[in-house]
Amino acid sequence: MPQLDFTWWIINFFIIWTAILLTLVILVNNKTAQNLTTTDSLQIEKNSTNWQWL
């Protein structure tokens, strides 16, 4: 059944390329989000707490 094999080849082709494109989009969005969080984290004031044992 060559038509069925060709149909599965097309389906697998689109599934693989969709997965690759989604992965690239997620990676690109994560890099921009990390750049935003690194600039925001520089403005955070760090305070320490002195613990007192009873």
UniProtKB/Swiss-Prot annotation:
InterPro entries: ATP8_metazoa. GO terms for molecular function: proton transmembrane transporter activity. GO terms for biological process: proton motive force-driven ATP synthesis. The keyword GTP-binding does not apply. Keywords: ATP synthesis, CF(0), Hydrogen ion transport, Ion transport, Membrane, Mitochondrion, Transmembrane, Transmembrane helix, Transport. The chain crosses the membrane at residues 8-28. It is a single-pass membrane protein. It is found in: Mitochondrion membrane. GO terms for cellular component: mitochondrial membrane; proton-transporting ATP synthase complex. The keyword Transmembrane applies. Belongs to the ATPase protein 8 family. Mitochondrial membrane ATP synthase (F(1)F(0) ATP synthase or Complex V) produces ATP from ADP in the presence of a proton gradient across the membrane which is generated by electron transport complexes of the respiratory chain. F-type ATPases consist of two structural domains, F(1) - containing the extramembraneous catalytic core and F(0) - containing the membrane proton channel, linked together by a central stalk and a peripheral stalk. During catalysis, ATP synthesis in the catalytic domain of F(1) is coupled via a rotary mechanism of the central stalk subunits to proton translocation. F-type ATPases have 2 components, CF(1) - the catalytic core - and CF(0) - the membrane proton channel. This is ATP synthase protein 8.
